[in-house]
Amino acid sequence: MMIVTTDRIDGYNVKAVKGYVKGSTVQTKHIGRDITAGLKGLVGGEIKGYSEMMDEARKLAIHRMAQDAEAKGANAVIGFRLQTSTVMANAAEIIAYGTAVEVEKE
C-alpha cells in the first residue's frame, strides 16, 4: 500500500478513486507515564513514555486507514493527513485519513 501526502504519485496514473478512508485510535495515559511526566516537568526534557505512546498510536491509525483502503479495493492512499485531538482528560485521538485510489504504472 502506497501512502503519500501529495495528490498524485510520480510514475503512476490514478485508474479509479475509491473514496475517503480513515483509521483512528484513542490512547490514554497511565499512572506510570503521568508520574514520569510530572518529574520531567520539573527538570525539562522529552517525556519518552508519551512519545512512544503517540508513535504507536500513529502507526495503528495509519494501519487501520490502510485496511479501510484495501477493503475498498485500493492500492494507494493520496492526500494523506494525520490529526490529533483531545477527547477527554488524559486521552487523545489520532486520526489518519486520505483518499483511497487504484493506481497503475505509467
UniProtKB/Swiss-Prot annotation:
Gene3D superfamilies (alphabetical): Hypothetical protein apc22750. Chain B
Pfam families: YbjQ_1 (PF01906)
Family annotation (InterPro entries): UPF0145_dom_sf (IPR035439), UPF0145_YbjQ-like (IPR002765)
Family membership noted in the UniProt record: Belongs to the UPF0145 family.
Full protein name: UPF0145 protein BH0643
Protein source organism: Halalkalibacterium halodurans (strain ATCC BAA-125 / DSM 18197 / FERM 7344 / JCM 9153 / C-125) (Bacillus halodurans)
